[in-house]
Design a protein with these regions (language model features):
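Extracytosolic helix-loop segments that constitute the early lumenal/periplasmic catalytic or substrate-binding loops
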Residues: 248, 265-290, 294, 302-307, ...
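Perimembrane helix-loop-helix junctions
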Residues: 223-228, 390-391, 420-454
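Start-transfer (signal-anchor) and selected internal transmembrane alpha helices
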Residues: 2-37, 202-250, 326, 442-453, ...
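Transmembrane-helix signature of polytopic, membrane-embedded enzymes
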Residues: 236-239, 313-314, 334-358, 376-377
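Aromatic-lined ligand-binding clefts that engage carbohydrates, nucleic acids, or primary amines
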Residues: 82-102, 134-140, 175
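Transmembrane signal-anchor helices characteristic of membrane glycosylation enzymes that use polyprenol
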Residues: 23-42, 230-264, 283, 449-467, ...
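Hydrophobic, aromatic-rich transmembrane alpha-helices
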Residues: 215-226, 516, 523-580
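Transmembrane-helix motifs of polytopic, lipid-linked glycan transferases
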Residues: 219-224, 317-342, 381, 562-565
Length: 666
């Protein structure tokens, strides 16, 4: 029976190769990540099990970088009334190095199998145990995170295992109560400002008037949706967004000094290195020099070109031009993808423009000097080119040139764009084989030419890395000679299953969970410009409005998810092979970038690693999902008896968009 079911399933899967590819691309990476989290010693992912818990010293939560080896002693006394009559064993796991003492006698232990700390060791301690009072002490050292211990004693009448009854101390300091290893502890500094709800109450009158004005504009604007006036609104919305962005740049972004921004000092050091030495640094030369060089070379070029005009333009202001134009370019990328997806639906194209123009993470990140906006723009251009290829009746040589150029430049800006390369290759191959019915020789020649162009553009840099370091990809979690960590330094399942802190205390809510981190950095400056204290947050933004956005945006988040589900439905039910291919490609591209963020949080388990703007390369697909979701809600509210709900919906939407803009312009 089971064989027959499996045979039918396999027959259906092989009959639809597109579905097979999508399933493999979705499920395969998930299985890989789960396997790494459970088995790999390079992934500090912890499981409490068998009645024992991982414990740690009660160090206060901090946003500062820690550049030291954590050394902690853990101890517990236990009593033995009589000889247990059987061997006594200690099953021990330590993150990462340990020394074990029973009654202050050192106990020699072999390294875990394959030196994998997750497997732990099992040590017989019977020779050192005596009747009466006994003590067990473990000294744990970890240069890449907090010192953690998991231990249970087997062979006794009662279970003795690590929990909150154990004592802990650092070196010769007094013994204190150990705490459970918890990666969801809040940063106390996040509690130093009012909650989002308190900010909403503070802005109650403003909310009322903006809501009323939004309902009025909806009523007046309904007139423009008779006939074919959507095209006019598309032009008006595009012009309005451009003017709004230009105002933000001239009035706000230009005022942000060189002390504000994510890793800003290191980005500036990279540019300064090129200015002074006229050379590209090695990945090990400084904190941020592991990044590919394109953004820094372009910044160097801008400074050199405008050097005679330094009396008019401040050099630091010039460095803001590339991130700003890239951020505005990301809005264009979303529009360009929307034109392909919604070629016969101007209303949803209008929604794409509005969604893209108001995504908060794109707005605030474009104000800071860094490589992320440029990387997102170039990766977005690659997606634009790809969807145009999928819409075209034939894959041509010039398509491969442009696609290879854009994707090569994106990978030369940041390695994250590399996750799109296999996705693009797989979908190009599917397009040519199953849609265009090309022979394998033609497919191989096109794909080979695309890879050649991309390699010519960016390959030299990665060959240089191989020459110096023995590997092409240098990322901040494996740089030679750099040992550092930040809280929490490890992760548990709870971190990936929790959510809610971003709705109460959004700033630094990234300490609480993966989803709080993404939510707080998508809808606002949840990590306050890379600063470690609320008192040092960027003073150009309006945090009254920004804090209120976090609650107002909760329905919008649901609408984005609804749009993603709608996209999946379109991918499954669309009968046009090119349209099906495009929407599936957008879903998988978004999924790949999001999965890379998840992997990075496993590899680098620090509070600031889960940032929504690492998904900025997928802003085009995100905007399409948003447009699909808002379009579905609009259709639900179309019946005339829902007029009150429609007024409520558009009043809320207008208030949300206004508050988002005032967060940065107010």
């Amino acid at each position: 029976m089971v064989r027959e079911i499996l045979a039918r399933v396999l027959k259906k899967i092989t009959a639809k190769p597109g579905v097979t590819i999508a399933v493999v691309l979705l499920v395969g990476p998930l299985g890989f990540l789960f396997s790494c989290a459970y088995f790999s010693p390079d992934i500090p992912f912890l499981f409490h099990h068998s009645g024992a818990f991982w414990i740690r010293f009660p160090e206060p939560v901090s946003a500062y970088i820690r550049g030291y080896t954590d050394r902690v002693h853990f101890a517990k006394d236990f009593y033995l009334d009589q000889d247990p009559g059987s061997p006594i064993w200690v099953h021990l796991k330590a993150f990462r190095e340990f020394k074990l003492y029973i009654n202050e006698n050192p106990v020699t232990a072999e390294s875990p199998p394959g030196k994998n700390w997750k497997k732990g060791v099992k040590i017989e301690i019977s020779p050192w145990v005596k009747s009466g009072r006994n003590s067990i002490r473990t000294h744990v050292e970890n240069p890449m995170g907090p010192a953690l211990l998991w231990l249970r004693i087997e062979g006794l009448k009662d279970l003795i295992a690590t929990d909150e009854t154990w004592k802990a101390r650092i070196e010769s300091s007094p013994w204190v109560q150990a705490i459970l290893a918890d990666d969801t502890r809040a940063n106390p500094d996040s509690l130093s400002v009012p909650t989002s709800y308190q900010y909403i109450r503070k802005k109650g009158t403003t909310i009322f008037w903006i809501f009323a004005a939004s309902v009025g504009l909806w009523g007046i604007g309904g007139f423009f949706f008779h006939g074919r006036r959507e095209e006019i609104l598309i032009k008006v919305a595009s012009a309005g967004i451009i003017m709004g962005w230009v105002y933000l740049f001239l009035a706000k972004m230009i005022r942000i000094g060189p002390a504000i921004g994510f890793d800003i000092s290191h980005h500036l050091d990279y540019i300064l290195f090129i200015l002074e030495k006229r050379a590209i640094p090695l990945a090990s030369d400084d904190w941020a020099t592991f990044h590919p060089p394109l953004f820094y070379l372009l910044s160097f070029g801008v400074l050199e070109i405008f050097k005679p005009f330094y009396s008019i333009f401040r050099p630091f202001h010039l460095l803001k031009v590339i991130p700003f134009l890239s951020g505005l370019g990301n809005v264009w990328v979303a529009y360009a993808i929307g034109r392909v997806v919604f070629k016969d639906d101007p209303f949803r194209l209008l929604l794409v423009i509005i969604v893209a123009g108001f995504i908060p993470m794109n707005i605030y990140l474009s104000a800071y000097v860094g490589n992320e906006p440029l990387h997102a723009f170039l990766a977005g251009c690659s997606l634009v080119m790809a969807v145009h290829i999928f819409r075209s009746p034939e894959v041509k040589v010039f398509h491969m040139i442009y696609l290879g150029l854009f994707l090569g430049l994106a990978v030369l800006t940041k390695i994250t764009a590399g996750v799109l390369v296999p996705v693009v290759v797989i979908f190009l191959a599917y397009k040519m084989i199953h849609v265009d019915r090309k022979d394998l020789k033609g497919v191989a020649s096109r794909l080979g030419f695309f890879i050649l162009i991309m390699t010519v553009v960016c390959g030299w840099y990665y060959i240089r890395n191989i020459t110096h370091f023995g590997r092409p990809f240098m990322i901040n979690w494996n740089l030679p000679g750099q040992l550092w960590w930040q809280d929490p330094g490890f992760h548990t399942l709870q971190y990936y299953l929790s959510f809610g802190e971003a709705l109460r205390h959004p700033y630094f809510s990234a300490f609480h969970s993966f989803w709080d981190a993404l939510y707080s950095t998508f809808w606002g400056e949840g990590l306050i410009g890379g600063k470690a204290l609320m008192a040092k947050r960027p003073d150009v933004w309006n945090y009254d409005y920004m804090s209120a956005v976090y609650l107002f945006a909760l329905p919008a988040t649901g609408i984005f998810l609804l749009g993603l589900l709608k996209a999946v439905q379109m991918a499954l039910k669309n009968t046009d092979p090119n349209s099906k291919l495009i929407i599936t490609f957008l879903i998988i591209s978004f999924y790949s970038v999001a999965l890379f963020i998840w992997l990075s949080t496993l590899k680098v388990p620090i509070y600031g690693q889960a940032k929504a703007f690492y998904c900025l390369a997928a802003m085009g697909p995100i905007s399409v999902f948003g447009a699909l979701g808002f379009g579905v809600v609009r259709e639900w509210l179309m019946p005339s008896h829902y007029i009150a709900l429609r007024a409520l919906f558009y009043g809320w939407l207008g208030t949300l968009l206004t508050f988002i803009y005032l967060s940065y312009a107010g």
